[in-house]
Amino acid sequence: MAVRASEISRVYEAYPEKKATLYFLVLGFLALIVGSLFGPFQALNYGNVDAYPLLKRLLPFVQSYYQGLTLHGVLNAIVFTQLFAQAIMVYLPARELNMRPNMGLMWLSWWMAFIGLVVAALPLLANEATVLYTFYPPLKGHWAFYLGASVFVLSTWVSIYIVLDLWRRWKAANPGKVTPLVTYMAVVFWLMWFLASLGLVLEAVLFLLPWSFGLVEGVDPLVARTLFWWTGHPIVYFWLLPAYAIIYTILPKQAGGKLVSDPMARLAFLLFLLLSTPVGFHHQFADPGIDPTWKMIHSVLTLFVAVPSLMTAFTVAASLEFAGRLRGGRGLFGWIRALPWDNPAFVAPVLGLLGFIPGGAGGIVNASFTLDYVVHNTAWVPGHFHLQVASLVTLTAMGSLYWLLPNLTGKPISDAQRRLGLAVVWLWFLGMMIMAVGLHWAGLLNVPRRAYIAQVPDAYPHAAVPMVFNVLAGIVLLVALLLFIYGLFSVLLSRERKPELAEAPLPFAEVISGPEDRRLVLAMDRIGFWFAVAAILVVLAYGPTLVQLFGHLNPVPGWRLW
């Protein structure tokens, strides 16, 4: 064992980013686990079952449904997704380029995220920041929540610099060459997030922090909401694109095939850079004070964002068909049966993609200026984003552990652990699909979101059937979560090591249609130009409205309703 440990230490000396990536992953999945433990209580609430009295006995610090909902949303939708992105979208390009990232900055970003998380968590646990994950003013939390959250989010700016520095060094050593695919995805992803995160940074610096410190009397809720949704919608793609990077560059290899088109993958990511951010007003269709013309423009741009996802569906499906036919699949659908359905690293993202199809269709409804009024602020909305982040993103992250943990730690995954992983991803998928049906159905029956409806059990008798779906989903997902916890820690705490696993290259897929000698690829590789175009689009989409809103500020004092 000592020999094995020394060999692993040697691997970490050669590739120190492995240990930092592992720290990001473990912290992220711990956040997912803790946040998800509150999930069944939310599901039971939407099944008209009030389980919060039981939760208060188990966890006395939980004072209300809304505190549990805040913890669930913050830990799952913000903390887990960000830490997973900081792990994947730094480690993958570093390994593709075979270059060492700036380790001082990588550890700085981890410590910023960790300290920010701890500082923000303390008021959350003390019921001093029960403001939900959207933290809309005039709901006012403790200053430590806003300060910790700001430090946590700003840690991503360090990650941005790390990847841009990797790319710059590679370009300097390889003049005239096209950026490799994974690195291209990472650079575009982080530039997209920089533009997107500016809204949240402005909200925190200009309003939330001075307000919570008592330096100003109040905040204009409409301005704060507008700045939040500047970030709040593109954060969906901050969740999504690390999963897409895995689906494009790792999944075809797991399936036994190749990626059919490198240029299509690049174009999809480039479109996300251009179109992800100037779309936030579709979350504010019901808000006064914003010109309907701008709402319509954002609605149209939101519909355009569906295009790169449709391109992804085509490219990935073609890649999987190629893999299935290489594995002996015949006939119209025989290739599907031939795919490796015994491999959780393959099954998890594929099931996530299947769930993403109705999730994307629901997103078209949300983006519509007229249809959104039917489902706005109903249970339909959490039904939609559970198909996005809780299905595709989370399942892809879970599946990635089966090739990533051995590469980071040298710890093998046994056949029994893989079988357990299959059970987890199928149960998780089943639970999310049942929940999606229940929440979408309840939303169409005007059951509201963000509501403690179990306290008024007679209010929605017409929604009794979809409520049964939500209860069933909560039970299935709890079983899946407990099995996942057992499986994850059985690997992390294992003493068996095989250093050759940690020394092996990542399973990047080969491509059929590559980037060589293509004018489109050369044009897309002018990333600085496209970033400037994206920035101009953001200024055009938000500038006129923000100028108007900042010229007519209406600050109101903070409220505490919990």
Swiss-Prot record:
Q: What is its main location?
A: membrane
Positions annotated to bind Cu cation: 233, 237, 282-283
Classification via PROSITE patterns = COX1 (PS50855), COX1_CUB (PS00077)
Which residues does the annotation say bind Fe(II)-heme a? 72, 386
Locations listed in the record: Cell membrane
- Report the protein name in the record: Cytochrome c oxidase subunit 1
* CDD domains per UniProt: ba3-like_Oxidase_I
Question: Which catalytic reaction applies to this protein?
Answer: 4 Fe(II)-[cytochrome c] + O2 + 8 H(+)(in) = 4 Fe(III)-[cytochrome c] + 2 H2O + 4 H(+)(out)
GO terms under cellular component: plasma membrane
Q: What is its EC number?
A: 7.1.1.9
Q: What class of enzyme is it?
A: translocase
Q: What cofactor(s) does the depicted protein rely on?
A: heme; Cu cation
Identify the coding gene.
Answer: cbaA
Pathway annotation from the record: Energy metabolism; oxidative phosphorylation
Q: Which organism is it from?
A: Thermus thermophilus (strain ATCC 27634 / DSM 579 / HB8)
Lineage, top ranks: Bacteria, Thermotogati, Deinococcota, Deinococci, Thermales
**Which GO BP terms, alphabetically?**
oxidative phosphorylation
